[in-house]
């Protein structure tokens, strides 16, 4: 890179920011990562409590393909199993999605939908689900779950959300068979950017998911600069010309941001192009981890609870990763949809734990006798909400980006998309070459004017 080309500014020291700098370095582009907090990793944090239980904040699962691409393939454990079921009541737990095809009322409803072809607005999530799966399955399972983690009625949500759900049933059948044959948690629809295959399976890195962030950070040309909040992104004629980090102006023609897209407009000085993203909403989560005696308390790793429970999903992670809990003990994670300040969010820890324990009886009859500890985490940025009100702007962000030359919004929160760590990696691997080329293009290189004079204040 030319000495006159200023480094790329990467805002955020979580996995998306670290991977951005990692990929830029692969293309010989200098980048400085600035993290507002005192440590790297963002949501992807791991720790072990005094009772010997290991916790991950953020994604639990990654694949062997992803870790191999990062050079971490030799430092991971293979997950022996992974599966999802849906609680339908009466002791019925059909597997998702295959087992639902064996429920007679769902099959009949879907067939009737195909035969009668009722008029439906396929831009609306409620109508799209009913069209694709039949009204009974949609109304009893899919839509209640969608509404629980989105926080909006399904007739106010965009059908784009359905594109995030795997629908290739034949492929799913084959991959399920591969799971049984290989006794590995073969990936099924977990990553949207790269295809599922029998040789791609879930693994867990030594040191937890936070170890991935540390591995990437340790191999960057420059140390991540901590406690350095981004305060401004300077724009002239809809082109990035600089940034202010922790009170210091920095000249650059390229900023890669991992901030939530609805907060990014607050930093922009010199353009209102991003104001349309201010009304985007994220749904929060209240995560309740229960420590229990025993194991194999749930019928499968994940149990979806579409009706009759205050949470939409219950997970017994030690069924997939036995090593995260002491022998003879397990953890049950209950996920409740919430918004900052609402009735669920403001419950005390004791109250929200009691709400979970008091309703888990249909799944774990002797739950009270088994519980001996709990922890609660409130995550304000759980899921992006694909509301119809701003679907046009959301689609434009996905196809056209921010609209400001040299400003790239990446990662789950930055792209406002239902993607996980591995999706972010493969997207960046495809995007970064063009970003690097533009950044080093002579027509985009700035002069050597000091940043204090070049950047407006």
Feature roles, as predicted:
Residues 115-232:
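Active-site/ligand-binding neighborhood in enzyme catalytic cores
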Residues 6-33:
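N-terminal Rossmann-like FAD-binding beta1-loop-alpha1 element of flavoenzymes
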Residues 66-95, 133-139, 219-226, 231-241:
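Feature captures the FAD/FMN-dependent oxidoreductase FAD-binding
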Residues 16, 39, 262:
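Conserved Rossmann-like nucleotide-cofactor binding loop
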Residues 46, 97-101, 317, 321-457:
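Conserved flavin/dinucleotide-binding core of flavoenzymes
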Residues 27, 229-333, 337-346, 350, ...:
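Mid-domain catalytic core of redox enzymes
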Residues 50-120, 124, 167:
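Dinucleotide-binding Rossmann-like beta1-alpha1 core, especially the glycine-rich loop
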Residues 25-48:
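Glycine-rich FAD pyrophosphate-binding loop
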């Amino acid at each position: 890179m030319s000495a006159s080309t200023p480094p790329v500014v990467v805002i955020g020291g979580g996995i998306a920011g670290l991977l951005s700098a990692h990929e830029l370095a692969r293309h010989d582009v200098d980048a400085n990562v600035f993290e507002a907090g005192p440590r790297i990793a963002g949501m992807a944090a791991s720790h072990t409590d005094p009772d010997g239980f290991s916790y991950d904040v953020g994604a639990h699962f990654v694949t062997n393909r992803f870790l191999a691409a990062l050079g971490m393939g030799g430092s991971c454990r293979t997950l022996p199993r992974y599966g999802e079921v849906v609680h339908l009541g009466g002791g019925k737990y059909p597997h998702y999605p295959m087992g639902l095809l064996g429920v007679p009322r769902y099959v009949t409803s879907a067939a009737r939908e195909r035969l009668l072809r009722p008029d439906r607005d396929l831009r609306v999530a409620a109508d799209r689900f009913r069209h694709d799966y039949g009204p009974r399955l949609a109304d009893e399972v899919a839509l209640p779950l969608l509404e629980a983690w989105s926080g909006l009625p399904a007739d106010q949500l965009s059908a784009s959300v359905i594109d995030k759900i795997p629908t290739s049933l034949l492929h799913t059948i084959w991959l399920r068979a591969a799971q049984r044959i290989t006794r590995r948690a073969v990936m099924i629809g977990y990553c949207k950017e790269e295809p599922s295959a029998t040789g791609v399976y879930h693994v867990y890195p030594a040191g937890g998911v936070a170890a991935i962030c540390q591995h990437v950070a340790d191999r960057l040309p420059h140390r991540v600069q901590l406690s350095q909040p981004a305060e401004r992104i300077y724009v002239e004629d809809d082109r990035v010309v600089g940034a202010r980090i922790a009170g210091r102006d920095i000249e650059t023609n390229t900023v890669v941001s991992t901030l939530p897209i609805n907060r990014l407009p607050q930093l922009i000085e010199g353009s209102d192009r991003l104001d349309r993203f201010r009304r985007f909403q994220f749904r929060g989560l209240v995560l309740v981890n229960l420590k229990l005696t025993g194991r194999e308390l749930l019928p499968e790793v994940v149990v979806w609870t579409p009706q009759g429970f205050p949470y939409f999903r219950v997970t017994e992670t030690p069924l997939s990763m036995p090593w995260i809990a002491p022998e003879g003990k397990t953890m049950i994670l209950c996920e409740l949809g919430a918004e900052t300040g609402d009735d669920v969010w403001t419950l005390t820890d004791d109250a929200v734990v009691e709400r979970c324990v008091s309703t888990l009886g249909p799944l774990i009859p002797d739950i009270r006798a088994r519980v001996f500890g709990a922890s609660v985490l409130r995550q304000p940025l759980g899921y992006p909400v694909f509301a119809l009100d701003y679907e046009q702007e959301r689609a434009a962000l996905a196809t056209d980006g921010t609209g400001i030359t040299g400003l790239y919004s990446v990662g789950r929160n930055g792209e406002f998309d239902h993607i996980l760590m591995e999706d972010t990696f493969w997207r960046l691997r495809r995007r970064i070459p063009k970003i690097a080329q533009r950044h080093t293009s002579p027509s985009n290189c700035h002069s050597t004017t000091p940043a204090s004079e070049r950047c407006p204040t």
